[in-house]
Amino acid sequence: MLSHLKAYFTHPRSWAVGLVFVSMGFLFGNWVTLIPYIKAKFDLNDAQLGVLLLSMPFGSTFMNPFATLIINRFGMRHSTIWGMAAMAIAYALPVSSPSIWLTSFSLVVTGMCLATTNVAMNTCVTAIEKHESRNIMSTSHGMFSVGGMVGAALSSFLIGLKTPAIIQVWAISLFVFVLAFAIQKTILSIYEEKNTDNNGSKFIWPTGPLLGMVAISLCINITEGIMADWSAIYVRDIVKANSFFIGWGFAGYALLMATGRFVGDSLVPRFGSSRVLVFGGILATVGILVAVLLPYTYTTILGFGMIGAGVSCGAPILYGSAARIPNMAKGAGLATMNTFSIAGFLAGPAIIGFLSNAFGLTIAISLIALLGLCWATLAAKVKIY
């Protein structure tokens, strides 16, 4: 594993695209830590917050089919650079908006920028893997988690110092904006071939093994959505942690997610995809029980970290498996998997918002335990390619 990571960090193009992943995670980690600020600013109840949080994934879902058109028109490299720059500015807008409606609109815009950058940077990774014979996808996704951890931890520290939220987000956004153009030359050196053939890359209704994989993906992505948007609220309102630690629940989650992704390439050949998924579901279930039954700062960070480790290998395994299903049009499995993954990530926060409003956040967030058991059971039965 160490040799694989050394090769990644000493290869300029891998390292440059890795910084794009880190930056996206860094911005996202900062945002999720400031969600309690948004809730307090507009005096929202949990159900209202859940609806507001639909805005960003709605923007991503809307933009997803157009992202490919943008990349085909302007190229993956320019789309990555300008997408990263636009995303940096967009992430500062929700906290800066004076009204709930402008906040919702700015979250939609942020989601659109995120979707475009996400497709572009993953296309860059695929190009590096194809033309330079390097396996960097799992590590690159791990870099996103590292960025999320650092962003959440830094934001928590700044909150503890009573730094105004607007100053915080604009300073971070400016840093990422400048970084986008600092790595421009290296990103532009990635080999890019013209490819406008999108045959087979359209959504199909899942059946057979793909249906089972989609069900597992829904469980995992609902869990990820819950952790992204509600972990800081849980730490503040239920655990009642010191303000310095508001983002540390998500930071712990992101840290062990990154660790899981960094070691995932060695775990899957040794234990098999199905066993890794089963263990991940069980680990996520145990993790949320630790956080719920022992609602203290350090036990909650530990529990959330276990959830991060549990979900870490889900996306790389399921996306790879969907792409390898025999007798299926090229790209069809991936397109379908991506559609349902976004839907799950979108649905999770809203579901928790309404459940929390009715039964309390502790009971609502315990839904993760059921999701973990569900995907562990399915993973033991579904064929993974």
Question: Predicted segments — roles?
Answer:
Residues 33-47, 229-245:
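Short amphipathic helix-loop junctions that connect adjacent transmembrane helices
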Residues 43, 75, 96-101, 240, ...:
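Helix-breaking motifs and short loop linkers at transmembrane-helix boundaries and internal kinks
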Residues 62-101:
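Conserved MFS/SLC helix-loop-helix module at the cytosolic interface between two early adjacent transmembrane helices
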Residues 78-92, 275-290:
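Structural signature of the two symmetry-related core transmembrane helices
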Residues 139-188:
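Helix-loop-helix hairpin linking two adjacent transmembrane segments in secondary transporters
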